[in-house]
A protein has these predicted regions:
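Acyltransferase
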Residues: 1-156, 160-162
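Flexible, low-complexity segments
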Residues: 20-21, 129-220
Length: 220
């Protein structure tokens, strides 16, 4: 991750990313009709598609979309991720990726590159090279989880970002839990999410939760 970030930061800052409140088919048709050098970067929702490309091309696309009353919003990013503008670092990134000793997942994992259950390919350098250039299929990934009956979603990160997109999907009676929140005590947030998991019937390893603290059980 750090090597990829370092390589990206050495790229010229000529790109932009734009969130579009339209389906991916509509967005792709407009891009192809106007021969714009723009790539689909993420498919987050049926009406939330992110594109990535050179700033001038993205500006042209934004104007075309606004004429059709399609809402858009620029993403606050340094570079045009998941696009052809990442190609200049592909060779060096592949060299780094080939040095890693990969292990195949021991638990089922959904690939946001394919939107399907990850295969052994995820433990290869070629997979992560594709991940650098190809779109994130968040919608397909979440749809698959819904088909499998998954209803508990925990975002592991410094702040909840994906939970907001997940809540827009038609997943009923779901639990959407952050691990951390800005301006919220870390331990308090973890305990709140643990409490929700417990009341939802999830088996909690309380010995692991309490291992760093002196405690005793009280009869209720």
């Amino acid at each position: 991750i750090t090597q990829r970030a370092s390589l990206v930061q050495n790229l010229p800052i000529i790109g932009a990313m734009l969130a579009i409140m339209a389906d991916v088919t509509t967005v792709r048709q407009i891009i192809e009709q106007d021969l714009l050098k723009i790539d689909i970067a993420a498919i987050n929702h049926r009406r939330n598609t992110v594109v990535s490309g050179e700033k001038k091309a993205v500006e042209v696309l934004k104007e075309l979309l606004e004429k059709q009353n399609i809402r858009t919003q620029y993403l606050t990013v340094s570079h045009a991720f998941h696009s052809r503008l990442m190609s200049p670092i592909l060779e060096k990134f592949e060299q780094v990726a080939r040095q890693i000793n990969y292990q195949t997942p021991q638990i089922p994992l959904i690939s946001n590159l394919t939107g399907d259950v990850a295969t052994k390919e995820i433990a290869t350098a070629s997979y992560w090279c594709r991940h650098l250039l190809e779109p994130v299929r968040f919608l397909d990934s979440m749809n698959l989880l819904q088909e499998q009956g998954i209803k508990i979603f925990i975002e592991i990160g410094a702040k909840p970002i994906l939970l907001g997109m997940g809540r827009q999907l038609p997943i009923h009676d779901g639990y959407w839990l952050p691990s951390l929140r800005p301006e919220q005590d870390d331990w308090l947030q973890l305990l709140e999410s643990l409490a929700t998991l417990y009341t939802a019937g999830v088996s909690i390893d309380w010995s692991a939760v309490e291992q760093d603290y002196a405690s005793c059980r009280l009869p209720l």
